[in-house]
């Protein structure tokens, strides 16, 4: 108890640290700015970046120093051009260098007080007028069509006041950061409030180290790093706050990017984790704040202007209520079992904890095992996604000694539960909890001793909408591949009808393609997609016009694109939005290194292009092999279902139903992509990083999983010299990787460059239901708890590991065991 009070005192002391910036409001603006820059990726590299750096040195900084304290600007604020603000942003994120450059050239630190961001929608007329007077030959907004690199180089070399800091490299280091903090939960008030509090705790550790003359490289998680960056964007406040706290300006070292085991980032994160937990008695790793893996490869390097093609989205749509599909919310959970007390003699060192949910859902419906930190001396963490309902149930299991036959069941010493709803509804009260839970003894357990208690640490992300997953089930009893759900209800159409069912096996709608050969009133070569709802209503959902499919009374259309390479889209869905369909898994669905057994050619990714997302945003994924679609947004549900049904039906018939392209054509176009992917997988199998898997649906149950596996469990990889493994299985299940020594963890960190996602050495991944073996490895291990159901995260067991990346794109999670 005294130790717990000491932890509380330390935390309260940390919260007394004074920050002269409203970090919550500033972080929201920071995220908005990063989002805007990401929509203008010409700022990341190339001639436009070189021109932006010149304009920053030659125009913006002189304007700022000339007018920032001038009375002529007192009536309004300066608004920098976007390109100049981005370079200024990256310069300030090296606070020591920025301060020294400002002092050298201007005699003082140039602050952002009196400056408004270009993305806030503020009037720029005053600043534009000042700019034109100072720089009549240089337009206020960067002219992308008039960039002369030779001229820029010549003018830059002639500047008297120009930083020698390598701003090109600084931009390249900062560019990936937005991906790490771009998930929707990051922008919520409660997540940012806790991030601010954790940032103060982070600074408190640094202060302690300086007072004790300890040289430690502290590495932040991404929630802390976001707030740290935000603080640095206010140069004078950051300088004053840091000098007051530690006597100097705290350096932000973002130059280290080597995430290998034993390197600076790896050891720094391990030591930061240990110091945090020793000082505050709470967990450092946090749901939704861990490394997501590398930024996905873009589907295009040129922004797509789609506004000309977009139809009016406000037009009345009588198809909106044709199908009923309840929205489901999802949270990411990070779980760790810290300790056990009052454990009876004879059980020490033999116990573990099985955890599950009282209300299993489509995202998490299995029982998983975790070791206890105090018993084994190694950190093991589970991250997974689930619906924010019911309770987490924990059972303390005592394993049998090795001399007792394996057939004997492990002894259940008791159970306890923790309500998810208590913390998330009706108002989110907190996103982290760590407490002792007293166990209720199981039947037959001794009751004459003190009650056993477990110390459980759980963190959550705020609930967000879960993607909708729908499956195409053929009504033919002999169907193979896509019929992994029982037929629900009676077939209202012909025997070749396709039932669309959700994850609960509830029928949503029944579809059938009807053509002129069926008789009736259809013209020659005309085809229709007919739909029958659960209420019995029959509607024409799509009509083939001879060159494209017209969907939902011409509100949408599905067209084939003449793709010259496998990297280009094959189809497009046009309507109130513009969606292009690419072969393979792209962007958020990009396959990771434990997903090799499912061919990337089995999938098609739906990518929306808009003014807000000129480089594309994933909105859905179609599994062509098993016939399913995941839709991230409601507007895509009906046009997405109809389009996926047409593509799945047409491509299997060799293109005879309206498209020339076939599955064979797609595979031929993608041979080079497949060859490159195979080469990368061979290389990555022997590297030190494992990243995450993406998939959408499961094959036939029990495929490759071993005993008790429901078919939803995904890959099982047991590696001898492997490290951790992330996962991203669209809310289903991820990889299981058990590794021994020579493993490294994955912190998060400064500028988005630190942290590790670790790869299994000598291991190969796989799709759902696959079992992968590495060197000196076999089978599944015992991490499944007797049944690998959907919704499990990855299991990674490693020695001397640090940090943990919580699932790619927020979809699933990891189980990481680290020293």
Curated annotation (Swiss-Prot):
Induction context: Up-regulated upon salt, osmotic, glucose or exogenous abscisic acid treatment.
Recorded hits in InterPro entries, A to Z, give: GRDP-like
- A GO cellular component annotation in the UniProt record: plasma membrane
Mutant phenotype after disruption = Increased sensitivity to salt and osmotic stress in germination and cotyledon development. Abscisic acid hypersensitivity.
> Mind listing the UniProt keywords for this protein, alphabetically?
Abscisic acid signaling pathway, Stress response
* Pfam families with a match to the protein in the record: C2_GRDP, GRDP-like, GRDP_C
Biological processes per GO annotation: abscisic acid-activated signaling pathway; cellular response to osmotic stress; regulation of abscisic acid-activated signaling pathway
General function of this protein: Plays a regulatory role in abscisic acid (ABA) signaling and tolerance to abiotic stress during germination. May be involved in the regulation of the ABI transcriptional factors.
Report the protein name in the record. Glycine-rich domain-containing protein 1
What gene is behind this protein?
GRDP1
């Amino acid at each position: 108890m005294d130790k717990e009070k000491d932890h509380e005192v330390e935390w309260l002391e940390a919260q007394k640290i004074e920050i002269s910036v409203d970090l919550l409001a500033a972080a929201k603006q920071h995220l908005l700015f990063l989002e805007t820059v990401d929509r203008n990726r010409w700022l990341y590299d190339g001639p436009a970046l070189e021109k932006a750096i010149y304009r920053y040195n030659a125009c913006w900084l002189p304007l700022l120093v000339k007018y920032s304290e001038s009375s002529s600007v007192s009536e309004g604020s300066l608004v920098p051009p976007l390109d100049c603000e981005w370079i200024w942003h990256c310069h300030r994120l090296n606070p020591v260098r920025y301060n020294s450059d400002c002092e050298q050239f201007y005699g003082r630190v140039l602050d952002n007080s009196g400056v408004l961001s270009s993305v806030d929608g503020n009037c720029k007329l005053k600043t534009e007028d000042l700019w034109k007077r100072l720089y009549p030959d240089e337009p206020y907004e960067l002219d992308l069509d008039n960039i002369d690199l030779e001229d820029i180089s010549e003018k830059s070399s002639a500047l008297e006041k120009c930083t020698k800091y390598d701003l090109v490299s600084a931009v390249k280091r900062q560019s990936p950061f937005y991906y790490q903090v771009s998930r929707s939960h990051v922008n919520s008030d409660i997540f940012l409030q806790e991030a601010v509090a954790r940032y103060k705790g982070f600074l408190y550790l640094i202060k302690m180290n300086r007072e004790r003359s300890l040289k430690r490289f502290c590495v932040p998680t991404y929630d802390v790093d976001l707030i740290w960056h935000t603080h640095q964007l206010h140069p004078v406040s950051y300088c004053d706050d840091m000098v007051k706290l530690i006597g100097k300006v705290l350096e932000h070292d973002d130059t280290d990017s080597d995430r290998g085991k034993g390197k600076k980032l790896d050891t720094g994160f391990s030591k930061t984790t240990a110091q945090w937990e020793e000082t505050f008695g709470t967990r450092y790793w946090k749901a939704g704040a861990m490394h997501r893996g590398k930024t996905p490869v873009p589907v295009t390097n040129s922004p797509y202007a789609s506004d000309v093609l977009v139809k009016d989205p406000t037009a009345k749509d009588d198809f909106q209520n044709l199908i009923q599909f309840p929205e489901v919310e999802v949270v990411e959970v990070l779980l760790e079992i810290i300790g056990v007390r009052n454990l009876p003699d004879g059980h020490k060192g033999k116990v573990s904890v099985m955890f599950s949910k009282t209300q299993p859902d489509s995202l998490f419906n299995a029982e998983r095992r975790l070791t206890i930190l105090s018993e084994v001396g190694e950190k093991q963490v589970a991250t997974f996604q689930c619906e924010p309902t019911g309770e987490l149930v924990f059972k303390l299991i005592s394993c049998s000694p090795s001399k007792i036959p394996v057939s004997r069941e492990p002894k259940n010493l008791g159970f306890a539960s923790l309500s998810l709803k208590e913390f998330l509804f009706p108002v989110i009260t907190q996103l982290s909890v760590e407490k002792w839970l007293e166990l209720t003894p199981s039947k037959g357990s001794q009751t004459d001793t003190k009650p056993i208690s477990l110390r459980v640490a759980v963190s959550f992300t705020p609930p967000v909408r879960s993607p909708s997953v729908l499956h195409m089930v053929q009504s033919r009893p002999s169907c193979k591949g896509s019929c992994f759900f029982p037929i629900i209800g009676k077939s209202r159409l012909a025997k070749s009808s396709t039932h669309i069912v959700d994850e609960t096996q509830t029928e949503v709608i029944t579809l059938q393609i009807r053509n002129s050969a069926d008789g009736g009133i259809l013209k020659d070569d005309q085809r229709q997609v007919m739909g029958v709802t659960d209420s019995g209503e029959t509607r024409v959902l799509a009509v083939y016009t001879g060159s494209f499919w017209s969907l939902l009374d011409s509100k949408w259309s599905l067209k084939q694109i003449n793709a010259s390479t496998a990297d280009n889209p094959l189809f497009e869905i046009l309507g109130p939005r513009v969606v292009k369909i690419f072969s393979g898994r792209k962007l958020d669905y990009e396959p990771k290194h434990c997903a090799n057994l499912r061919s990337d050619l089995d999938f098609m990714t739906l990518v929306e292009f808009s003014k807000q997302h000129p480089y594309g945003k994933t909105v859905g994924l179609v599994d062509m092999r098993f016939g399913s679609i995941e839709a991230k947004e409601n507007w895509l549900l009906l046009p997405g279902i109809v389009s996926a049904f047409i593509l799945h039906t047409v491509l299997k018939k060799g293109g005879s139903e309206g498209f020339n392209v076939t599955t064979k054509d797609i595979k031929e176009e993608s041979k080079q992509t497949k060859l490159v992917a195979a080469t990368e997988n061979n290389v990555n199998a022997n590297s030190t990083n494992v990243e995450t898997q993406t998939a959408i649906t499961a094959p036939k149950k029990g495929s490759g999983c071993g005993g008790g596996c429901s078919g939803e469990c995904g890959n099982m990889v047991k590696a001898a010299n492997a490290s951790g493994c992330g996962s991203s299985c669209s809310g289903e299940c991820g990889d299981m990787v058990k590794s021994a020594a020579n493993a490294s963890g994955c912190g998060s960190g400064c500028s988005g460059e630190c942290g590790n996602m670790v790869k299994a050495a000598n291991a190969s991944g796989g799709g759902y239901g696959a079992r992968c073996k590495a060197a000196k490895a076999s089978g599944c291990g015992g991490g499944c708890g007797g049944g690998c159901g959907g919704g499990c995260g990855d299991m990674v067991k490693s020695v001397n590991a640090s940090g943990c990346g919580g699932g790619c794109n927020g979809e699933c999670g990891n189980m990481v065991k680290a020293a």
